[in-house]
């Protein structure tokens, strides 16, 4: 099981700092990392990630510059590109595949892409080696979840975590800390999904403190840390310090 899936916003604090952060993440032993593509209308993001995206945009971190800046980087965990559909459509499918090819990006998590809405776009990316991460909300029925998992198939145990996992949304609403997350429904949800598929599961939205992360791990799932980490970095902490207490074996 992957013990932690952190989230970073590309371009915050700067595009120039991104290679160093990715290198530090790999040195910490993180096998995968979510990398947010800054977007001006991030409907699923809470105030912390919205502010980070705006800072990145203000410093010139366009989607194109982010992807171009990732080219050739090898000292990095596997990246899951966390993004919205419109910036990708503006780049175009063919160009997007060419841009992704020399980067450490292994998969995409497109938060506002309804399942089945852009089949040709999604299929082209998957065939090029960039599958879409299945996103399973609390309102997703089990029948629907089974369909999504079948249409976004597990490539198998030989594939990296970044290309295998399904993302379980812990609660409705936007990302962020301080809102509280009742993990009892999450435990039931994880158990239900385990009966449908053997693929790895990651749980995100509203997780931040070491106790909640440990609870998610006890379910055999990977906790996602986003807003708490992004805020710590914005407050001037280094990556190792920001993740202190949240890694397995800390504390």
Please provide the spans of the model-predicted regions.
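Hydrophobic faces of well-ordered beta-strands that scaffold small-molecule active sites
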Residues: 4-8, 33-35, 79-83, 108-110, ...
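Glycine-rich phosphate-binding active-site loops on the catalytic face of alpha/beta enzymes
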Residues: 32-42, 105-109, 114-117, 167-177, ...
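Alpha/beta catalytic cores of nucleotide-metabolism and tRNA/nucleoside-modifying enzymes
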Residues: 187-199, 208-251
């Amino acid at each position: 099981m992957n013990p932690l899936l952190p989230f970073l916003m590309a371009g915050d604090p700067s595009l120039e700092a991104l290679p160093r952060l990715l290198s530090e993440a790999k040195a910490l032993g993180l096998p995968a990392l979510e990398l947010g593509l800054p977007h001006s209308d991030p409907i699923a993001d809470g105030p912390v990630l919205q502010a980070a995206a705006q800072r990145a945009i203000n410093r010139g971190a366009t989607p194109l510059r982010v992807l171009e800046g990732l080219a050739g980087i090898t000292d990095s965990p596997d990246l899951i590109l966390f993004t919205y559909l419109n910036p990708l459509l503006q780049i175009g499918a063919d160009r997007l595949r060419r841009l992704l090819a020399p980067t450490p990006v292994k998969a995409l998590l497109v938060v506002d892409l309804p399942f089945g809405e852009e089949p040709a776009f999604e299929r082209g990316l998957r065939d090029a080696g960039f599958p879409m991460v299945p996103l399973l909300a609390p309102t997703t029925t089990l029948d629907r979840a089974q369909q999504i998992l079948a249409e976004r198939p597990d490539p198998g145990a030989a594939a990296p975590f970044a290309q295998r996992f399904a993302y379980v949304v812990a609660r409705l609403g936007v990302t962020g800390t301080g809102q509280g997350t009742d993990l009892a429904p999450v435990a039931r949800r994880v158990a239900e999904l385990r009966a449908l598929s053997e693929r790895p599961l990651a749980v995100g939205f509203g997780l931040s403190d070491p106790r909640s992360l440990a609870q998610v791990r006890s379910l055999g799932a990977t906790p996602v840390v986003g807003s708490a980490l992004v805020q710590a970095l914005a407050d001037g902490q280094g990556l190792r310090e920001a993740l202190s207490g949240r890694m397995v074996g800390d504390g």
